[in-house]
């Protein structure tokens, strides 16, 4: 069932200029996945975006086929739209989205937000939010993209390695405020993906808050792992690792990483 009151609240919290970039906002009380719902809809036209949020999400998409549950009071939503960007730079989508989440949290009063490659948001070395980017189709340099985000707003039923905004901020924002603030920053940052200068800014800004940068880490690729020093990321968003046999580069959809004990 659709929830027009929450959709209206998100719309009202968005700055008026950025409302023009959204073709629609759909909020549904219970969904398997906001990404799946948007994938089943017709793509938006050019620079317009569609937003789908769920009050309860039963099977959100994660990396490496993980499934995530998000209950009432948490934040689960996805965007779908066209972006003008060369296909080789699609790896920067998640990094740019992470910067949008970070900027939104800072404006809401959250400090010391850390970014974990390639698509997670951390506070105090614990996971606050994650995201997943899917390229649905391409037309030249235009990419039809679905970007899903899940954020722990409430601390109820979280695993020990996760953290929530609840108790970490003076005033806990509503779900509508959080979705609107993140959407505002995402729409504001979209154009950066289309130019070399903008992509360089994404890379520099992301590295300035990167978790474990310059430290020993272990990278898993399937059942195999490799250890090394995390050097940073390439101009396409891939991870650079200094190992005993030289530098290795890993793409975001191939690996997971952890710090060495």
Map each language-model feature to its residues:
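Short loop/edge segments at beta-strand edges and connector loops
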Residues: 29, 115-117
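Conserved active-site carboxylates
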Residues: 120
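Long, positively charged amphipathic alpha-helical accessory segments at protein N-termini or as interdomain linkers
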Residues: 1-11, 21, 86-87, 91-113, ...
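N-terminal lobe of the biotin/lipoate ligase/transferase fold
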Residues: 1-110, 136
